[in-house]
Amino acid sequence: MTSKNTICLWFDKDAHEAARFYAATFPNSEVTAVHKAPGDFPGGKAGDVLTVDFTVLGVPCMGLNGGPQFKHSEAFSFQVATDDQEETDRYWNAIVGNGGQESECGWCRDRWGLSWQITPRTLTEALAKGGAEAKRAFDAMMTMKKIDVAQIDAARRG
């Protein structure tokens, strides 16, 4: 990694598999390096994958196979802006359909427990506007799991 700021994500043992999934799912994403452990470590043994360098939508990340001590939580999430329902559906279905879980308000978790916010731009634009339009869009969002772009647009119009 050459970036001065890299997100380090702790995985039990599947960092390489997760990184490959993210690279296949999101544009401007790739696995850039795989580093094997030079010796035994709490999550594995010499020769096992220790870290994986990758990008998600251009954001540099490192996956660390550290063992089961720490779990992902909603305290950290990737927010992915989408342009339309097709893009929203594609990302949501890839994450949830690959062993993930739906949550509320556009949030979901992948099979490794990492949280994602799949957020159509129409929603963030409405919330940024403030006022009655923001309140209507917010109220509509609060009833959803995956965000329905048509319903958000209808709420924006009143």
Regions found by a protein language model. Give the residues of each.
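Short, solvent-exposed beta-strand edge segments and adjacent coil->beta transition regions
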Residues: 2-6, 73-77
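Core segments of cupin and vicinal oxygen chelate
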Residues: 9-58
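A short, polar/charged loop-to-alpha-helix boundary motif
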Residues: 122-140
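Acidic/histidine-enriched, glycine/proline-rich intrinsically disordered or flexible terminal extensions
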Residues: 134-158
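Short, small/polar residue-rich loop motifs at catalytic or cofactor-binding pockets
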Residues: 4, 48, 101-103
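A charge-rich, low-complexity, intrinsically flexible signal that marks solvent-exposed coils, linkers
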Residues: 41-43, 74-76, 157-158
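Vicinal oxygen chelate
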Residues: 11, 25, 56-60, 71-72, ...
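Extracellular/periplasmic catalytic domains that process cell-envelope and extracellular macromolecules
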Residues: 1, 44-48, 55-56, 70-72, ...
